[in-house]
Amino acid sequence: HQANARIVESLSQRLDIPLDKFFCNLDKYGNTSAASIPIAFDEATKASIFKQGELGLFVAFGAGLTWSAILVRF
């Protein structure tokens, strides 16, 4: 989840993916824990950020080094 902006920025740098490719809503809601991906997905969909045929990667990680990811083609 988007616990803080530093995590998103670090991931952007480590994966060499431009920060503008990340959808971040921390400034609006803060840390929403497990709800962060569904909330961000809903906002991005309503804003028509995803284009048909594009890939979207949703990654979540939390305590105990647990993580999960899903790759979606729109």
Role assignments for model-derived ranges:
Residues 1-74:
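Claisen-condensing/thiolase-fold acyl-transfer catalytic domains that form or cleave C-C bonds
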